[in-house]
Amino acid sequence: SNSYIGGLSDGFYIIIDCVDDEEYMGFFCISTKTLVEPQWFSVTIADEGIGINELVLVEDMDAGFGYVDRFGHVVIECQYDWATPFVEGVAQVGKWIDDDYYEYYIDTTGNEINLMMNSFTQHQLLYL
């Protein structure tokens, strides 16, 4: 396996580990001096930076998107089909439920913080 370190972003280094032609990502957090072993398909740090209570967006190839803290502890299980990084305590997520796709906002505990923004059927998405 080959490992390498990506660029510095808001006090985080992205760590990438290549095993059998698969890439797994983790991170090193400078402020907590914590190395979180590569285990996800992707790791995303918000462009605006991460506040002290903000979370890191991670993607599991099978389970989808979720969020971990600066120590790598899972805070919101990987469960979303689409998600954005948290900015000022809010993230936007999307999820398929049966044949309907829902997008909504969540707080850093995973609770929905307003009504679902959009709801489309699979058929309607073909025409967007």
Residue ranges and their predicted role:
Residues S1-L128:
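Residue-level detector of conserved, function-critical positions
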